Structures are given as structure tokens and as C-alpha cells.
């Protein structure tokens, strides 16, 4: 027993400063050794399922992209089914504060109401717009871990320009951006106890009480919710809905990429340390794997994904193909050196391989398979990237790079 305690102390003390791994990351079957990554062959981006070469933008948009999205829908994230009864969507601005952050911005609290014969549910959507910028403004929409009805979204009194949750909204306002937040647990519980109590119930036909194997899991429900946020933004005269960047961190980074891949109304996507089922390649099996994900979070993906546990090479897709489905709209991937659970190398390679499609469509992408040096961001490219030192979080350095990327790709001439 004493030996075990001593081992754990040495293990914890020996971690680099800033490392904040959870217990799951110490599982003995988790691989962090680059020399143990298996040989793999990625599914081709520019060859159709019937073997036809994809050589034109038209062939990509009309043939290959729909094929890939269909595979991700039915095998990874799950399809949103046709509801038995149409879902009505309506918006209600329940509160408006034109003096938010000492007059720097206006805050709107919006209820997005969803209902049909099966029931009703609401999302609490937040919209912040800078007061000193000509409207309509471009904006960021963030998949939030923080409850949008909590005081996390109040202005901080101790850190000017920040929310109580630490987000530097003052910097966004100074740069002329709006900021929006959607809390996906309004729509779907993220564990097996709460999973069945949310949006899924509105879509069931009579007699169904659980999603089919190919139907939507948590991440797909999150993506659907963000698109309802976009529905509202299309009605808000203060927001330029043609210049919306969708973003998210960690689990919400996974949802972000799936949101942007499907919903072309989003002009730009930012994935922050999204890892497995986000930007990282499945086939590398480095850090978190499909097995780890579906064991701990069985409903994040659709149940068809379970078939590929320890058989990732049998998947007809990998995550570079998800990023490619966002093209030609810009996408940005953020990694960090100590976030080994998210496989930063796999995240970069995914973005690098997706660049092939961006170039086909007349855009620009990552030029080298070598990961850039720390704090050497790639910004002047339709596929952007940076890696910094440290662990699993969004730091001020990251926020600033996200804004820099948006300045290049969203700001009007």
C-alpha cells in the first residue's frame, strides 16, 4: 500500500507546471508515446465512395462532401431525425441591458422556444453587442459550459473587461465584435441520467423513447441547438449573421466542428483543444480514443460509433474529413503542449490534411506536415492553427489569436 501511495506522489509531483490531467488520463492503456502510434492510412478526401476522382469544386460540393457528411451523420454523431410533428421555433427577448459593462455593450437575454405536440423546451441564449460600433456587427457564438442563466455571465467587478467566468468580452467589444453564448444543457443532458429529458423527446414518433443507433447523440444535439441560435441571429438587426464565428472548447470544440460542417451559415469555425471526435485523428489512437469516449460518455456520439471501438481503421472517415467539410469557410485549430489527452499532433495533422480541399476550392491551407513552433500561429491561411505551452484551457493568448484570425477573415475591407 505504501508503495502505491509513494508512486502516486512521485507521479503527481513529476508533472510539468500547468499540467492538470484527470485520473482517466493515467489509465495504463492510454498511449502518449509517439513511437507506439500505429501505422495508418487515412481515407482519401478527393476520391468518391465509388472510386471517382474529385477534381473540381463542383464535384466536391455536389458529390464528395454530401457523401462524407452522410457518413459522419450515420456513423459518428448521429442524424437528427424528422420529427413526428413539426417543431415550432419562436424567439422572445426577455431582458435588455443597454448599459452592460459600464456602457461598453448591450446585453440581450433571449428565450428560444421549441414546441410541438410532444412537449416544449426552451434555450436561454445570450447576445452582447458593442455600443460604440456601427451596426450590424460580426460576432462570435460560443458553445458554453457555463449556464447562460447564471451569474457567470455578469460583468466582473474585480477584472474590468471580463465576465465573471473569465471571458474577455471587453476585448471583443473593443475590436467591434458581438458575442453570443448558448448553453447546450438547456437542450440535452450530457450524462445517461439526464440524456432522455431534453430535446430528443420532441422528435420521437409514438412508441419511441430512445434514439435509434444512427440517430443523434449529445454532440449532434448541441450542434442543432447552435443552429437555432443562428436562426435567432438572422432576425437581430444588430448582428451581421453572415459574419458569425462558431467556437467551442474541449467537448464543445467537438460540437463546434460538427455544427460548422453541417450549417454553412456560420462563416468561420474555431476548435479549441477539441481532441477525440473533434479535430484529432481517430487512427492515431493517441490520448483519448473512441473506446475511452464511449465507455465514459456513451451518449456523446450515436450508438453506431460503438461498432468501431478498437477498429478505427474500419471507419470510412477520419476527422480531417470533418474539417474539410467546413471548406471553403475558414477554420482555426488550437492545441497546447501539455494537453496530451487531446493529441495536439493529431489535431494539427487533421488540419493539414484538410487543407487539400481548401486548395481545391481556391483557398489556402497549411503547407507543412510539421507542427508549427510554440506561439507561432498560422493566421494568413484559410486553415489556421496555433499551439502554446500549457494545459487544457483557453488562455488570453488563445482568445487574442482567435480574434486575430477573425480580423483577417471576417472584417470587411
Regions inferred by a protein language model and the residue ranges of each:
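Primarily recognizes the serine-hydrolase "nucleophile elbow" in alpha/beta-hydrolase
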Residues: 221, 228-288, 292, 296, ...
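Sec-dependent N-terminal signal peptides
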Residues: 4-13
Amino acid at each position: 500500500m505504501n508503495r502505491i501511495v509513494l508512486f502516486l506522489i512521485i507521479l503527481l509531483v513529476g508533472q510539468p507546471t500547468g499540467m492538470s490531467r484527470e485520473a482517466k488520463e493515467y489509465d495504463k492503456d492510454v498511449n502518449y508515446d509517439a513511437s507506439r502510434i500505429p501505422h495508418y492510412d487515412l481515407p482519401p478526401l478527393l476520391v468518391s465512395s465509388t472510386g471517382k476522382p474529385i477534381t473540381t469544386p463542383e464535384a466536391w460540393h455536389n458529390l464528395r462532401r454530401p457523401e462524407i457528411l452522410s457518413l459522419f451523420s450515420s456513423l459518428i454523431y448521429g442524424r437528427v431525425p424528422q420529427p413526428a410533428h413539426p417543431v415550432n421555433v419562436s424567439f422572445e427577448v426577455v431582458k435588455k441591458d443597454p448599459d452592460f459593462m459600464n456602457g461598453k455593450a448591450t446585453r440581450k437575454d433571449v428565450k428560444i422556444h421549441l414546441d410541438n405536440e410532444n412537449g416544449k423546451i426552451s434555450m436561454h441564449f445570450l447576445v452582447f453587442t458593442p455600443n460604440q460600433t456601427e451596426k450590424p456587427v460580426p460576432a462570435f457564438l460560443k458553445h458554453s459550459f457555463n449556464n447562460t442563466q447564471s451569474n457567470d455571465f455578469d460583468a466582473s467587478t474585480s477584472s474590468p473587461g471580463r465576465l465573471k467566468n473569465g471571458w474577455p468580452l471587453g476585448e471583443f467589444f473593443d475590436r467591434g465584435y458581438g458575442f453570443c453564448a448558448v448553453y447546450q444543457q438547456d437542450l440535452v443532458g450530457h450524462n445517461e441520467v439526464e440524456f432522455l429529458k431534453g430535446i430528443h423527446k420532441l422528435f420521437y414518433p409514438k412508441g419511441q423513447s430512445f434514439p435509434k443507433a444512427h440517430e443523434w447523440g449529445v454532440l449532434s444535439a448541441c450542434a442543432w441547438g447552435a443552429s437555432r441560435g443562428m436562426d435567432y441571429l438572422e432576425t437581430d438587426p444588430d448582428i451581421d449573421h453572415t459574419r458569425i464565428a462558431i467556437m467551442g472548447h474541449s467537448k464543445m470544440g467537438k460540437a463546434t466542428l460538427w455544427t460548422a460542417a453541417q450549417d454553412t451559415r456560420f462563416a468561420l469555425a474555431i476548435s479549441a483543444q477539441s481532441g477525440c471526435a473533434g479535430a484529432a485523428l481517430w487512427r492515431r489512437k493517441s490520448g483519448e480514443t473512441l473506446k475511452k469516449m464511449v465507455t465514459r460518455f456513451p451518449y456523446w456520439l450515436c450508438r453506431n460509433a460503438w461498432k468501431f471501438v478498437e477498429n478505427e481503421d474500419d471507419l470510412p472517415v477520419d476527422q480531417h474529413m470533418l474539417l474539410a467539410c467546413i471548406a471553403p469557410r475558414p477554420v482555426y485549430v488550437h492545441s497546447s503542449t501539455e494537453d496530451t489527452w487531446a493529441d495536439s499532433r493529431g489535431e494539427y495533422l487533421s488540419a493539414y490534411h484538410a487543407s487539400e480541399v481548401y486548395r481545391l476550392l481556391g483557398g489556402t491551407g497549411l503547407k507543412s506536415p510539421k507542427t508549427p513552433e510554440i506561439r507561432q500561429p498560422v493566421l494568413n491561411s484559410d486553415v489556421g492553427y496555433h499551439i502554446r505551452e500549457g494545459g487544457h484551457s483557453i488562455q488570453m493568448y488563445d482568445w487574442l489569436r482567435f480574434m486575430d484570425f477573425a480580423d483577417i477573415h471576417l472584417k470587411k475591407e
